Amino acid sequence: MKKTALYHWHEQAGARIIDFGGYLMPVQYSGIIAEHRAVRSAAGLFDVSHMGNFYVTGERSEAFLQYMVTNDLSKVRDGEAQYNLMLYPNGGVVDDLIIYRLDSKTFFLIVNASNTEKDYAWLQQHIGAFDGVCLEDHTDRLSLIALQGPVAIDIVKTVFPSVDFDALLQFQFCRTLYGDAPVMIARTGYTGEKGVEICLPNEAALPLWEALYDAGRACGISPVGLGARDTLRLEMGYSLYGHEIDQDINPLEARLKWAVKMDKGSFIGREACQQVELHLTRGVAGFSIESRVLPRQHCKVYNTDRQEIGWVCSGTLSPTLQEPIGTCNIVRKYITSGDSVFVDVRGTLHKGEIRRLPFVKTSLG
């Protein structure tokens, strides 16, 4: 089992540790609800070093990635990042990822922890058609720290005073130094709040983590585990691989059409997406439940005539709204905000309501 460079800090902080994606990771510290609320009201510090990361370099690196992903990388300038998906030829999702453009020949990819080996193999399988392009896995060399919340930018400013964070917009990044260590700081995140994600060599991770934590103490900063990371993303309706998206779900079903650019030229899965677009019958929607039960993945969803129309993708008790919420993959004609549905939780049907996503408003608006 792998450990991140911050593992011993988590252990000393009393975190509950679990196996996630082959890493020993903190699932919670003080508790999921308290950590969630800290991010929504102040700031949270996340160790997400288990995420996979690759460098793609070479003269034809952009052409290679344009073929591998759904979004249009030609629209991305140096110092910008873009949300993307890799698809199988049938339109199912290999993974979702963020691509950072350092320059025209250098791209940095962050992928889901559970898919790192699969993604590397998928990219490597197709790279041969693009002469001179090189793929390198740096997952074991680099740490990734996320600082998220309404006061996150105020905190990071004190640790990196030379960086003009006011000029750094969402999905932009800069490169600087922390001591002698090269650092990449991106205005990205998985919570819906203002914040940054910071990538740096493993040996510099602990000093930076402690500096950010100390700088945020007066603001109410909290370390945050994977448990609250999931409730935060679910309140925003963000997709998680293996839940809202997977190898059998087309991104058009999953509310991700905005990240699929049919007119950019050829990419793997394009023809399948075009066919799905013509005959789109299902979609992912948000829902809430009236009773205090927790809807879980694979619970069946029914219409008011008690006909099965789909299944739950993700579910939780929203710490912000204090009610059970979730996402479901259902027949499209039932995706109307305010419509009633029924969710089967442990053999009992519970009345719910289709909800507009995201469930909450945040510091990003």
From Swiss-Prot:
Catalytic reactions of this protein: N(6)-[(R)-S(8)-aminomethyldihydrolipoyl]-L-lysyl-[protein] + (6S)-5,6,7,8-tetrahydrofolate = N(6)-[(R)-dihydrolipoyl]-L-lysyl-[protein] + (6R)-5,10-methylene-5,6,7,8-tetrahydrofolate + NH4(+)
UniProt keyword annotation of Transferase present: yes
Pfam families (alphabetical): GCV_T, GCV_T_C
Annotated InterPro entries: GCS_T, GCS_T_bac, GCST_C, GCV_T_N, GcvT/YgfZ/DmdA, GcvT/YgfZ_C, TrmE/GcvT_dom1
A GO BP annotation: glycine decarboxylation via glycine cleavage system
EC number annotated for this UniProt entry: 2.1.2.10
Swiss-Prot/TrEMBL keywords: Aminotransferase, Transferase
Source domain of life: Bacteria
GO molecular function: aminomethyltransferase activity; transaminase activity
GO cellular component, one term: cytosol
Family: Belongs to the GcvT family.
Subunit composition and interactions: The glycine cleavage system is composed of four proteins: P, T, L and H.
HAMAP family named in the record: GcvT (MF_00259)
Function: The glycine cleavage system catalyzes the degradation of glycine.
UniProt protein name: Aminomethyltransferase
Species: Chlorobium phaeobacteroides (strain DSM 266 / SMG 266 / 2430)
